[in-house]
Amino acid sequence: MVETTGISDQTKKVLIGVAAAATVAGVGYLVYKSFGGSDLERDLEEIKALGNLKFKEKQYDSALEAFTKGVEKAGPNSSDQIVAMLYQNRAACREKVGHSPFDILNDCMAALKVDKKYTKAYLRAAKALNDVGKKQDALAYLLAAFTLDSSLNKTNFEFFGKLLAIEPMSDCHIGKPLKIEDVKPQPVALFRIQQWCDTWDILDLFKTDLTRFEPEVLSEDQKQYQLALEKFKKGKYEELIDLLTEENSYPPAMILRGKMLSYSTDPNEATRYIDKVGAKINELIGSEEDEERKKLMRDAFDILKIELMYTMADLDKFLESVPKDDKERLFKLYSFASIFVVIRLNHFYSLKIWFQYNGCVLDTAVTNHEQQMMADTNNANRLLTEAEKNGTLTPHLSMIVTFLKLCTSEDYADVHRRIREMEELAESRSTHFNLVLMSKVYMMTNNEESSKKLLEEAARITTRYLVPSRHLQTADLHVHKPEAERLRLTTESANAAIAVDPFNFSAHVLHLLGTNGPEPMIKKENYERAMESIRNAALFAPPRELLMLKRMIPLMNAKKRAAEMLDMY
């Protein structure tokens, strides 16, 4: 649509749908003439008014001719804003008559050279850039338009989402956090430790040993293992890898070393280690005389194997290889596998809530995951069904089953029934896991007061690997607050989680939202912090979450460029 108001301040936000203003073009012209001005200005205004009239009458060739006459009459050195309108209006005509996107783009650029805060020119340039295959540039120009006029967000959301899915993602290199090599001891992924420990209402080798590990005679390898257990109790998880040496040949120590390597900055090291010592672990487990301890070690090793798998196909193949008559083993493995999937799903629901209330500029990152969320839900349900065939579900597993049914229910009465079932489970066993999950359900149903009470109760449990998830859940309490307050409190929640777990994926994504918010451009200080948040989040991000972070790189770069073009960086 062409620009029609001759005397308006072009630095003001221009709304899509400005066509209605065309009806008052004549009035605008008379007002302009009453102000006086140079002969050239009056001539250009007359030409623009004629072009607008022809455009309104759908005589696009005639309108294009008029705007071209105005551009030529203005000359190359004109800085009058009416010249920017002539270029932008000619670009609109070029669209209508089917001219090359390069010609459209050239007119938009000429308009922006005169008026660098011309909203319509940025929007039309973005579409032309997309048409010539320059999606990254198009994203920057679109965000500049969003910055000048936030009302464009909704009307151009589909276009924005298309630009955000920039390929190939191989060009989006994240890199390591700054000075990560200087961090001693090297960090481990606390959310992975939580994922493992959330199955501890099922008998576990390490839960058993943490409660009591007192062999009559301790070998040096067992002493090393005992010391590792003590450090685990104190929350010093990062120290375990250096403590449990590669030479240790005590099976529980070897399995624990493999687990901690899988939670490290280089999880492939765990695969290499298990490839090297796996046969020896199996041999040592087989020679264990205590049958109960043999089963515990075997199950612990099986769970480690699951943790090292990357695809559901690998997981299903492994589970199918377990003898069908070994129900106890099948129950434990299917139970852990379901938790393995559910924790990932839990991250998605949190991210969805945070993105939903922090503006559309990051929403698309979540919608890309919708199908995977449903796939994870289906896989978790399937694994839990198999677990239930082989044993009685524990309180945690029962809570998860009900939660999954709640998330997929479309019946109002059934939703309330599932919530009540979860409330009863949480009341009967007030573990940190149950309290935080129940608080999430309350937030999903807008029961902020009940959610807050449960989180306060959960705060009494201070086990280190549990604390970050509670802080992250606390962020959900602020989603309905005014934007400035919401962003401040969101940042506080993220910082609290990061203080305990410096490289928590979800916390850094939350921090990214809190420091940058929904703004379509970004200032220098926030840009540098945002990029470091992405690097920190990527350190332990699972493969799919890593893809989401990679998609944030072109977005942040486009935000930066938008700010630079508008002199706001």
Swiss-Prot record:
* Name assigned to this protein: Mitochondrial import receptor subunit tomm-70
Q: Is Nucleus tagged as a keyword?
A: no
Read off the InterPro entries from this record.
TPR-like_helical_dom_sf (IPR011990), TPR_rpt (IPR019734)
GO cellular component terms given for this protein: mitochondrial outer membrane; mitochondrion
Self-association state and partner proteins as the record states: Forms part of the preprotein translocase complex of the outer mitochondrial membrane (TOM complex).
Concerning SMART domains, the annotation shows: TPR
What this chain does, per the entry, is described as: Receptor that accelerates the import of all mitochondrial precursor proteins.
Query: In which domain of life is the source organism classified?
Result: Eukaryota
> Which species is this record about?
Caenorhabditis elegans
| Topological domains, Mitochondrial intermembrane | 1-12
Give the membrane topology, semicolon-separated if more than one: Single-pass membrane protein
Residues on the Cytoplasmic side? 33-569
Q: Where are the transmembrane segments?
A: 13-32
TPR repeat residue numbers: 44-77, 119-152, 221-254, 510-544
- Tissue-by-tissue expression: Expressed in body wall muscle cells, the pharynx and structures in the tail.
Return the similarity comment: Belongs to the Tom70 family.
Q: Which GO terms describe its molecular function?
A: mitochondrion targeting sequence binding
Q: Which GO terms describe its biological process?
A: activation of innate immune response; cellular response to virus; positive regulation of defense response to virus by host; positive regulation of interferon-beta production; protein import into mitochondrial matrix; protein insertion into mitochondrial inner membrane; regulation of apoptotic process
Query: Quick check: keyword Mitochondrion in the entry?
Result: yes
Q: Where in the cell is it found?
A: Mitochondrion outer membrane
Look up the coiled coil feature and give its residue ranges: none
The alphabetical list of record keywords is:
Membrane, Mitochondrion, Mitochondrion outer membrane, Repeat, TPR repeat, Transmembrane, Transmembrane helix
